[in-house]
Amino acid sequence: MGSSHIGASNVPVTPWNFLSLLDYQSDLISSKAVVIPVPYDGTASYRAGAREGPWAVIQASRELEDYDPELDWEPSQMGIYTAPPLEPHMAGPEHMLERVRRAVGTLAQGEDVV
């Protein structure tokens, strides 16, 4: 887990992104992967809360080891950009899905999408 510095006092802070990557590991231009948080639970029939999922995944990722011993590889080496969370579209899941498609299309710029 890395740290960044903010402000004139250079107070160390932990980056708020997937795996807590430093700026050079997580900028949009050079990253090969993008995480798009989609906080949406517009169709919850019992209890809302799915919208907290992206936050929980990013929070948990901050505790992960960034090394895969089987592959002898660190995913952060490819760069992973964490996009800002998408604003929920409460008109229904079709509208939210279209919002996700637009965001993915904008970020992918012709690259492969998984």
List each language-model region with its residue ranges.
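Metal-dependent C-N hydrolase catalytic cores
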Residues: 2-114
